[in-house]
Regions:
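Active-site-adjacent loops and short helices of periplasmic peptidoglycan-processing enzymes
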Residues: 1-97, 106-110
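Domain-terminus/edge residues, biased toward the C-terminal soluble/receptor-binding domains
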Residues: 76-80, 88-195
Length: 195
């Protein structure tokens, strides 16, 4: 998690052309894998996803192949990934059932669970941000004390494209039991309230 990663300049033009959500890292900035994981999970930083994919697998294509292999291992029979960001591609498809399966498996990993349930994270000083900067969860930072009947929302990951609509994978605790809820295709846009 402490491995340094430099964000390559060539990933930014395509992400900006697609109006992708960015965490705030800059081309040539060096941050840790941990910082980029928080950047991917909290503010949906596409630049973090791209940089991590290249760091882990050498290329976006090789990483996507690993994503599809893991999906098959998990029995996600209606899922096919085309990129590490979740940005629209007509062949990049899944279902809420498959996303719930992935969320359940991922939550078994202690590091992922911490990322999924964190409201804010401060990136320490980097070569481009000498004061560091703070990122907030696109879900938890907007809930502001909202509670469920006899429960609470523990964490979640939002997503949005014009084609997919508003999407959400969330973890809640109700009466001492944990529940995963995945929704997709909701109306609105990336600035619509998450509830």
């Amino acid at each position: 998690l402490d491995t340094p990663v430099t964000l390559p300049e060539e990933i930014f033009p395509a992400l900006q052309a697609q109006n992708a959500s960015l965490a705030g890292f800059q081309a040539g900035e060096t941050a840790t894998v941990r910082d980029l994981l928080y950047g991917a999970m909290l503010p949906s930083g596409a630049e973090c996803c791209e940089a991590l994919a290249r760091e882990v697998s050498g290329s976006e294509e090789a990483f996507v192949a690993r994503m599809n292999q893991k999906a098959a291992e998990l029995g996600m029979t209606a899922t096919h990934f085309c990129n590490p960001t979740g940005l629209h591609d007509p062949e990049h498809v899944s279902t809420v059932r498959d996303m719930a399966r992935l969320t359940e498996a991922a939550l078994q990993n202690e590091t992922f669970r911490k990322l999924f349930t964190t409201e804010r994270y401060t990136v320490p000083a980097t070569n481009c941000h000498p004061q560091g900067f703070t990122m907030h969860s696109t879900l938890l930072s907007q809930l502001d004390g909202t509670e469920l009947h006899s429960g609470r929302i523990l964490g979640g990951k939002t997503g949005y494209t014009g084609e997919a609509g508003l999407c959400l994978a969330s973890l809640a605790e109700v009466k001492g039991r944990e529940y995963i809820l995945v929704t997709a295709g909701a109306g609105g846009n990336h600035s619509t309230a998450p509830y």
